[in-house]
Amino acid sequence: MATRLSDAEIEERLGDLTGWTRQGNEIRKTFQLPSFPSAIAFVVNVAFLAEAAGHHPDIDIRWRKVTLSLTTHDAGGLTQKDFDLATQIDEIM
Protein backbone atom coordinates (compact mmCIF):
# COMPACT_ATOMS: atom_id res chain seq x y z
CA MET A 1 0.00 0.00 0.00
CA ALA A 2 1.20 3.51 -0.79
CA THR A 3 2.07 5.81 2.10
CA ARG A 4 -0.32 8.67 2.77
CA LEU A 5 1.32 12.09 2.47
CA SER A 6 1.31 14.71 5.23
CA ASP A 7 -0.35 18.09 4.69
CA ALA A 8 3.07 19.71 4.27
CA GLU A 9 4.11 17.12 1.66
CA ILE A 10 0.85 17.63 -0.21
CA GLU A 11 1.27 21.41 -0.30
CA GLU A 12 4.86 21.03 -1.50
CA ARG A 13 3.84 18.71 -4.33
CA LEU A 14 0.90 20.92 -5.32
CA GLY A 15 3.42 23.71 -5.80
CA ASP A 16 4.99 21.66 -8.59
CA LEU A 17 1.68 21.31 -10.45
CA THR A 18 -0.27 23.92 -12.39
CA GLY A 19 -4.02 24.18 -11.93
CA TRP A 20 -4.45 21.28 -9.52
CA THR A 21 -6.17 22.08 -6.23
CA ARG A 22 -6.72 20.13 -3.08
CA GLN A 23 -10.27 19.40 -2.05
CA GLY A 24 -10.26 17.28 1.08
CA ASN A 25 -8.50 14.01 0.36
CA GLU A 26 -8.34 14.64 -3.41
CA ILE A 27 -6.50 16.76 -5.89
CA ARG A 28 -8.62 18.03 -8.76
CA LYS A 29 -8.21 19.85 -12.04
CA THR A 30 -10.62 20.89 -14.78
CA PHE A 31 -9.38 20.84 -18.36
CA GLN A 32 -11.06 22.90 -21.09
CA LEU A 33 -10.83 21.23 -24.50
CA PRO A 34 -11.70 22.74 -27.90
CA SER A 35 -14.56 20.32 -28.64
CA PHE A 36 -16.52 17.40 -27.22
CA PRO A 37 -14.66 14.85 -29.39
CA SER A 38 -11.31 16.24 -28.22
CA ALA A 39 -12.51 15.99 -24.61
CA ILE A 40 -13.35 12.32 -25.15
CA ALA A 41 -9.98 11.72 -26.84
CA PHE A 42 -8.26 13.33 -23.85
CA VAL A 43 -10.16 11.02 -21.48
CA VAL A 44 -9.09 8.01 -23.54
CA ASN A 45 -5.46 9.10 -23.25
CA VAL A 46 -5.88 9.57 -19.49
CA ALA A 47 -7.39 6.08 -19.31
CA PHE A 48 -4.28 4.57 -20.90
CA LEU A 49 -2.01 6.41 -18.45
CA ALA A 50 -4.19 5.39 -15.52
CA GLU A 51 -4.30 1.76 -16.57
CA ALA A 52 -0.52 1.64 -16.98
CA ALA A 53 -0.10 3.17 -13.52
CA GLY A 54 -2.76 0.96 -11.93
CA HIS A 55 -4.24 4.14 -10.50
CA HIS A 56 -7.56 5.49 -11.77
CA PRO A 57 -9.02 8.99 -11.45
CA ASP A 58 -12.64 9.93 -11.04
CA ILE A 59 -13.65 11.56 -14.32
CA ASP A 60 -16.46 14.05 -14.94
CA ILE A 61 -17.13 15.03 -18.56
CA ARG A 62 -19.34 18.02 -19.34
CA TRP A 63 -19.25 18.91 -23.01
CA ARG A 64 -15.75 20.37 -23.49
CA LYS A 65 -14.77 20.33 -19.81
CA VAL A 66 -13.15 17.34 -18.15
CA THR A 67 -12.61 17.32 -14.39
CA LEU A 68 -10.23 14.76 -12.96
CA SER A 69 -10.03 13.90 -9.27
CA LEU A 70 -7.22 11.83 -7.82
CA THR A 71 -6.94 10.11 -4.45
CA THR A 72 -5.54 6.82 -3.22
CA HIS A 73 -8.54 5.04 -1.73
CA ASP A 74 -6.66 2.22 -0.02
CA ALA A 75 -4.41 4.75 1.76
CA GLY A 76 -7.36 6.92 2.77
CA GLY A 77 -5.94 10.06 1.19
CA LEU A 78 -3.29 11.46 -1.09
CA THR A 79 -0.09 9.60 -1.93
CA GLN A 80 2.78 10.05 -4.35
CA LYS A 81 0.77 7.96 -6.84
CA ASP A 82 -1.72 10.82 -7.18
CA PHE A 83 0.95 13.39 -7.91
CA ASP A 84 2.80 11.10 -10.32
CA LEU A 85 -0.37 10.54 -12.34
CA ALA A 86 -1.27 14.25 -12.23
CA THR A 87 2.17 15.05 -13.67
CA GLN A 88 1.73 12.48 -16.45
CA ILE A 89 -1.71 13.86 -17.28
CA ASP A 90 -0.36 17.40 -17.50
CA GLU A 91 2.35 16.19 -19.88
CA ILE A 92 -0.19 14.95 -22.44
CA MET A 93 -2.04 18.27 -22.57
From Swiss-Prot:
Its EC number is 4.2.1.96. It holds the Pfam family Pterin_4a. GO terms for molecular function: 4-alpha-hydroxytetrahydrobiopterin dehydratase activity. It catalyses: (4aS,6R)-4a-hydroxy-L-erythro-5,6,7,8-tetrahydrobiopterin = (6R)-L-erythro-6,7-dihydrobiopterin + H2O. GO terms for biological process: tetrahydrobiopterin biosynthetic process. Keywords: Lyase. InterPro entries: PCD_sf (IPR036428), Pterin_deHydtase (IPR001533). Disulfide bonds: none annotated. CDD domains: PCD_DCoH. The keyword Lyase applies. NCBIfam families: PRK00823.1-2. Belongs to the pterin-4-alpha-carbinolamine dehydratase family. This is Putative pterin-4-alpha-carbinolamine dehydratase. It comes from Roseiflexus sp. (strain RS-1). The lineage of its organism: Bacteria, Bacillati, Chloroflexota, Chloroflexia, Chloroflexales.
